[in-house]
Structures are given as C-alpha cells and as structure tokens.
From Swiss-Prot:
Forms part of the ribosomal stalk which helps the ribosome interact with GTP-bound translation factors. Is thus essential for accurate translation. One of its GO terms (molecular function) is mRNA binding. One of its GO terms (biological process) is translation. This is Large ribosomal subunit protein bL12.
Length: 122
C-alpha cells in the first residue's frame, strides 16, 4: 500500500514544529541535500549579475556551557513553549529563523552569542 501525496501532506500538517524540523533533517541526510543551500541552475550569460542576498537563515550550531539561558533566549526568539525550545536547542545544529533580513539576523546572532551559544548566519 502506498500513500498518496495528500495523505503525506495531511500527516505532516498534524506534526509539531519539532517533528517537522527532525523530518527535514532526516530527509536532508537520506537524500544528501541541504535545504539551506538549494539553488537553481541558470544558463551562463555574458554579463555577470551580482545580486545582494536579502534573506538570511540563522543557525544554532552549538549551545555552549550555558544551556538554560540559551533555551530562554530561543524561547523568546521563536515563541515556542519551554519543552519545544529545549528540544530545539538540544538538537543543534538547527535552523532557528529562516528568511529574515540581515539586521535581524545579526541582532539574533549577537543575542545568542551573549548567552554562550554558537551561531552562524547563511
């Protein structure tokens, strides 16, 4: 018995944010891809067009020694509950925020680094 696309979509829509994050990570690992680095291939043109990146993803790469302050900060940033924030922090490296502007990404990075977390912006 195979599942239809609609059944898969229904199952995903009933998952928690943490489960979706884990599912995404599992899919990246299984298929050898990264959702953070998906790009489209465009034909080569004679003129090089340089586009400035306007949207950034904030990655929590490590929590450091101060786990509780990091969890509290992640809770305030993401709006997650305590349990979900704790699970998210413990599953580092993980994406905390996606498609945000550069200023917000830098602010989040500084805030998290202040409490001892290691953060990357991509």
């Amino acid at each position: 018995m195979s599942l239809t696309k609609e059944q898969i979509l229904d199952a995903i829509s009933n998952m928690s944010v943490m489960d979706i994050v884990r599912l995404t990570s599992m899919m990246e690992e299984k298929f050898g891809v990264s959702t953070a680095s998906l790009t489209t291939v465009e034909p080569d043109t004679s003129e090089a067009i340089v586009e400035e990146q306007t949207e950034f993803n904030v990655f929590l790469t490590a929590i450091g020694n101060n786990k509780i302050p990091v969890i509290k900060t992640v809770r305030s940033i993401t709006g997650l509950g305590l349990k979900e924030a704790k699970e998210l922090v413990e599953s580092a490296p993980v994406i905390l925020k996606e498609s945000i502007n550069k200023d917000d990404a830098e602010t989040l990075k500084k805030t998290l680094e202040t409490v001892g977390a290691s953060v990357e912006i991509k």
